[in-house]
């Protein structure tokens, strides 16, 4: 069943606009292609305006896990840290749907 890599980022308010532009123009398009994801979506929380969430869709959990532990992902993490270390705190979750109605 479909799986998602969910990346939650808490963004320092002083860099929110730069982060948003970078994610829109560079990171999301590059990640979609490199991750071989089915789709990539992102947005800002309406509960906490400094929380950014990105969703990368995969056909199944195996595909998402393969990406999560790949050299590709390590490279993306390294590049992200070059831009945003100390300004953005993020976490990752893998979720496989167990039910769809």
Task: Tell where the protein language model's regions lie, with residue ranges.
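Macromolecular interaction modules
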Residues: 1-101
């Amino acid at each position: 069943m479909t799986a998602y890599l969910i990346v939650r980022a808490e963004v320092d308010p002083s860099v929110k606009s730069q982060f948003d532009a970078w994610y829109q123009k560079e990171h999301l398009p590059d990640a979609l292609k490199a991750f071989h994801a089915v789709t990539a979506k992102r947005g800002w929380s309406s509960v906490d305006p400094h929380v950014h969430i990105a969703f990368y869709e995969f056909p199944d959990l195996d595909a998402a896990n393969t990406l999560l532990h790949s050299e590709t992902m390590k490279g993306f993490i390294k590049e992200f840290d070059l831009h945003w270390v100390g300004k953005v705190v993020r976490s990752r979750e893998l979720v496989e749907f167990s039910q769809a109605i």
